Amino acid sequence: MNYEFEREIGFINSQPSLAECLTSFPPVADTFQSSSIKTSTLSHSTLIPPPFEQTIPSLNPGSHPRQSAGAGGRPKSSPAGSRGSPVPARALQPPEYPWMKEKKAAKKTALPPAAASTGPACLGHKESLEIADGSGGGSRRLRTAYTNTQLLELEKEFHFNKYLCRPRRVEIAALLDLTERQVKVWFQNRRMKHKRQTQCKENQNSEGKFKNLEDSDKVEEDEEEKSLFEQALSVSGALLEREGYTFQQNALSQQQAPNGHNGDSQTFPVSPLTSNEKNLKHFQHQSPTVPNCLSTMGQNCGAGLNNDSPEALEVPSLQDFNVFSTDSCLQLSDALSPSLPGSLGSPVDISADSFDFFTDTLTTIDLQHLNY
């Protein structure tokens, strides 16, 4: 039994040719017999399937005398040498290419983990790592790295032609050392990028137009509000001026009525001097004959001047009134009260209505047309 085991080990360490392995196939009984011998000689604690070489009929010592003779002449080797024996068998396998690894990886992943663990011992750790790497990286396609010159030429062509015909695409691909598919894909991506850029610009322009319209509307509304506010201020100012004017007239009439009864020729308190009053004072120096009459006229005219009245527009200039005499003043007083000349020494009785009429007649004089 030991002799057979030694001859078996010697055959395992030997290197049979590939033709012998392929031409001679054992019967089913021999295969099971050799596997049972191998498993009986090994330790019964671990059940290891027979290696790939034991499935070949050359395990029988009497089948090939040349192999048995070679096995008898080789030195004995330890069982540790049988563990490293699959390495030369792996060297006989054809080289593996990346596309072959991808297919193998797909098949290996389909197998359950238990079957993979009980597989032949010739698959080492390195091979499993290579299969894992090939399965992980083979599914992803690498991006094309274009050079600066290629990108420049492609951008130039895209500037003139957004779409390429096939002859031009083939020409550019040959010129730039690219494939036709790469040129086609680049133009597709560039067209999509151009479309996104134009859409973004249109959106920005539309938003800017809406903002400008809103700003213009706000400005117009502000201007309208300002104009309305100014109009309201002007109207309120005009109303205040009219109220102040009527209040001054009423105050003057109330002060002049008792002074007329007392016969006093006192001056009345008037608002600050205007340009018309200054002209009246200058006019007093030219006609010193009637100082009292002109002073009363100036004060009354300054107090009740209203250039907007229709009487003021119809009155001629004051060139005809450069010289006033006492007779004219007396005539005016006679028109107001016929009993005034006869009762000069007595207090004059002038009603409020007659005084208002007197002030209205004086306001008709247009003092702005005075010519000096």
From Swiss-Prot:
Asked if the keyword Iron-sulfur belongs to this entry, the reply reads no
Stretch list, region Disordered = 42-96, 194-225
**Entries under SMART domains matching the protein:** HOX
Q: Which residues form a coiled coil?
A: none
Keyword Glycosyltransferase part of the UniProt annotation: no
Subcellular location field: Nucleus
Question: Where does it primarily localize?
Answer: nucleus
Residues annotated as signal peptide: none
Any one GO MF annotation of this record: sequence-specific DNA binding
What name appears for this protein in its UniProt entry? Homeobox protein Hox-A2
Q: Which organism is it from?
A: Rattus norvegicus (Rat)
Gene it is expressed from? Hoxa2
